[in-house]
């Protein structure tokens, strides 16, 4: 038993893009119905009937070709409901199935005359011109009906294979051939348009040409050799992919599924449609007109003009504006062709396939978070609850706060204190990734420990800004949540901001203080010119430890740049270390006091240090105390 809803996994090694043969293009769009009828060819330019709003049969939205527009319902309405699955309606010929088949079922247009593919003709390099070993200008003259090309010189002594002839030149040769005294028995054959191009490409025997080119390459050098190698490379690629050169000339055009070029009704009763429908309509109209002209044996000049117009219509469909005048729609806007949909920044590959939105991600503006540690970032509660929702739901159920997922989601929507408590537990030790586009080197995406913050902006430590090339003038950053334990471990071990201090490019530190940080550090440690230094023992300016200085500063008893005497048990390095003290005094208890400009030491009888006071500013005490705390915490 097969079920269309089941996905079958096909494992493959690679995807190969090659030229499609006309038979392959017809295979894509052609289907045989159970009643034996073959469908797939789009023959009418109509889209929908504006009275019934149903797709026209054999048109660009035909339900017989592409499938029903409503689930389990045929065009005429005879069959409705899923129980008729797979039945083909006898009246309208529509298969009863799901409407989503209209996203992948293709059709085709059988052309009344071959047309050249504009990519291979006008691309850089032009593969048609390289294969035929002709200048691109000459090939264009043939394709767009400006010149004839000699396909077979026959017995004519002045003609050569692939020689170009103007209209007048060919008329003269015709007069010569059909003259009564003509000695030409084997008449020369000439062609024009994509048909002639197809004939020239069919005449190429790739293996023989490749062999001949290899021999010529051995005996040539310089520019000529480079040109021969270029041609040989193209021919070898054709041989390797089993593609024929004449497939670059189209006999059949695929019609992409209708749901990929939709037509939607607007509020006022008007319709908005994809540009592709207009381009396909032009091709079908011109193709039908050409077929009718050929049927009634119209004059050659009229048929030729119609063939040229068909060529231009197909060019516009494949790549509008590549050659000739750009086809425009309403208000002179160029119509978007198949190439425009694929290529560029907004194209299918870069926008939709490479630039997909992923689950468990979000983005917001960044603001500075000076109180954060370097490996932390501030994550808005609103974002965190959304990103970590599955983890929160799991924990709520496990802790018996709720019984099911539905109840958990309701609780989360209310943002109760219980939920916030659980969220705090969930994010504890769960790193997140921050990315700033463009990610030009590996430090453009780093891991951080999230801290819940109010507001809607992500808080970032200022020291990691150089790595991201970020500033706080409106930059946005993306957040990603690593889900697997392996991913979380890797993020913590390899990607944590505090583990990425050196630049991978130069090996120099990339985490360097700048701007406000440098200015703040300078201001904190600067000496105020002309400030008076207190005497040792002045109770308002002498302190027993660094903490006492900071408490006095916080209580506004002293200013940031005031001089203070503070007891300090650590090592002190200064320029006066080697000089003799400015004052040395022995006390009655056997101890000795030595004084320098910025230091006062007291030693016991054995010369061991009892106490040390240093003269410094409050700002320098704050700086030193902060560094000691940070080192101790690490």
Curated annotation (Swiss-Prot):
Binds 1 Mg(2+) ion per subunit. Binds 1 Zn(2+) ion per subunit. GO terms for molecular function: DNA binding; DNA-directed RNA polymerase activity; magnesium ion binding; zinc ion binding. Mg(2+) binds at residues 471, 473, 475. Its EC number is 2.7.7.6. InterPro entries: DNA-dir_RpoC1_gamma (IPR012755), DNA-dir_RpoC_beta_prime (IPR045867), RNA_pol_asu (IPR000722), RNA_pol_N (IPR006592), RNA_pol_Rpb1_1 (IPR007080), RNA_pol_Rpb1_3 (IPR007066), RNA_pol_Rpb1_3_sf (IPR042102), RNA_pol_Rpb1_clamp_domain (IPR044893). One of its GO terms (cellular component) is DNA-directed RNA polymerase complex. Zn(2+) binds at residues 74, 76, 89, 92. It catalyses: RNA(n) + a ribonucleoside 5'-triphosphate = RNA(n+1) + diphosphate. One of its GO terms (biological process) is DNA-templated transcription. It comes from the Bacteria. Its cofactor is Mg(2+); Zn(2+). The keyword ATP-binding does not apply. Keywords: DNA-directed RNA polymerase, Magnesium, Metal-binding, Nucleotidyltransferase, Transcription, Transferase, Zinc. Pfam families: RNA_pol_Rpb1_1, RNA_pol_Rpb1_2, RNA_pol_Rpb1_3. Belongs to the RNA polymerase beta' chain family. RpoC1 subfamily. In cyanobacteria the RNAP catalytic core is composed of 2 alpha, 1 beta, 1 beta', 1 gamma and 1 omega subunit. When a sigma factor is associated with the core the holoenzyme is formed, which can initiate transcription. PANTHER family: DNA-DIRECTED RNA POLYMERASE, DNA-DIRECTED RNA POLYMERASE SUBUNIT BETA. DNA-dependent RNA polymerase catalyzes the transcription of DNA into RNA using the four ribonucleoside triphosphates as substrates. NCBIfam families: PRK02625.1, rpoC1_cyan. This is DNA-directed RNA polymerase subunit gamma.
């Amino acid at each position: 038993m097969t079920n269309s809803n089941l996905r079958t996994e096909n494992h493959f090694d690679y995807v190969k893009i090659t030229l499609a043969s006309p038979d392959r293009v017809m295979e894509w769009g052609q289907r045989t119905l159970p009643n034996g009828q073959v469908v797939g060819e789009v023959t009418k330019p109509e889209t929908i009937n504006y009275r019934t709003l149903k797709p026209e049969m054999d048109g660009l939205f035909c339900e017989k070709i592409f499938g029903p527009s409503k689930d389990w319902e045929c065009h005429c309405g005879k069959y409705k409901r899923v129980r008729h699955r797979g039945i083909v309606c006898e009246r309208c010929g529509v298969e009863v199935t799901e409407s989503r088949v209209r996203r992948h079922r293709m059709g085709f247009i059988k052309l009344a005359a071959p047309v050249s593919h504009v990519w291979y003709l006008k691309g850089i390099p032009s593969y048609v011109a390289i294969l035929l070993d002709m200048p691109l200008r000459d090939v264009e003259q043939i394709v767009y009906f400006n010149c004839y090309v000699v396909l077979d010189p026959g017995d004519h002594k002045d003609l050569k294979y692939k020689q170009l002839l103007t209209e007048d030149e060919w008329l003269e040769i015709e007069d010569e051939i059909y003259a009564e005294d003509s000695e030409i028995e084997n008449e020369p054959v000439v062609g024009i348009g994509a048909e002639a191009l197809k004939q020239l490409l069919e005449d190429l025997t790739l293996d023989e040409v490749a062999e001949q080119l290899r021999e010529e390459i051995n005996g040539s050098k310089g520019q000529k050799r480079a040109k021969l190698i270029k041609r040989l490379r193209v021919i070898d690629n054709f041989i390797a992919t089993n593609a024929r050169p004449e497939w670059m000339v189209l006999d059949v055009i695929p019609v992409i599924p209708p749901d990929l070029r939709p037509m939607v009704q607007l509020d006022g009763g008007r319709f908005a449609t994809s540009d592709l429908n207009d381009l396909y309509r032009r091709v079908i109209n011109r193709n039908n007109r050409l077929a009718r002209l050929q049927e009634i044996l119209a004059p050659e000049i009229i048929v030729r003009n119609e063939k040229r117009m068909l060529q231009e219509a197909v060019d516009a469909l494949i790549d509008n504006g590549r050659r000739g005048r750009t086809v425009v729609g309403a208000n002179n806007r160029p119509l978007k062709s198949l190439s425009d949909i694929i290529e560029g920044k907004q194209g299918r590959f870069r926008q939709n396939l490479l630039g997909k939105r992923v689950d468990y991600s979000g983005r917001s503006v960044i603001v500075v978070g000076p109180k954060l540690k370097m490996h932390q970032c501030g994550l808005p509660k609103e974002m965190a609850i959304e990103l970590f929702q599955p983890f929160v739901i799991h924990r709520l159920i496990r802790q018996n706060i709720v019984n099911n997922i539905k109840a958990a989601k309701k609780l989360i929507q209310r943002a109760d204190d219980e939920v916030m408590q659980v969220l705090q537990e969930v994010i504890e030790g769960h790193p997140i990734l921050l990315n700033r586009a463009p990610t030009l080197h590996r430090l453009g995406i780093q891991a951080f420990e999230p801290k819940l913050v109010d507001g809607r902006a992500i808080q970032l430590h200022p020291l990691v800004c150089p790595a991201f090339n970020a500033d706080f003038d409106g930059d946005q950053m993306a957040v990603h949540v690593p889900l697997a334990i392996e991913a979380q471990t890797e993020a913590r071990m390899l990607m944590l901001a505090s583990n990425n201090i050196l630049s991978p490019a130069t090996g120099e530190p990339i985490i360097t203080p700048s701007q406000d940080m440098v200015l703040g550090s300078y201001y904190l440690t600067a000496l105020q010119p002309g400030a008076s230094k207190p005497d040792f023992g002045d109770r308002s300016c002498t302190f027993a430890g660094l903490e006492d200085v900071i408490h006095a500063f916080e209580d506004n008893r002293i200013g940031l740049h005031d001089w203070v005497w503070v007891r300090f048990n650590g090592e002190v390095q200064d320029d006066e270390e080697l000089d003799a003290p400015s004052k040395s005094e022995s006390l009655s208890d056997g101890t000795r006091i030595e004084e320098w400009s910025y230091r006062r030491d007291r030693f016991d009888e054995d010369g061991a240090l009892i106490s040390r006071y240093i003269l410094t500013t409050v700002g320098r005490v704050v700086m030193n105390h902060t560094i000691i705390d940070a080192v101790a915490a690490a």
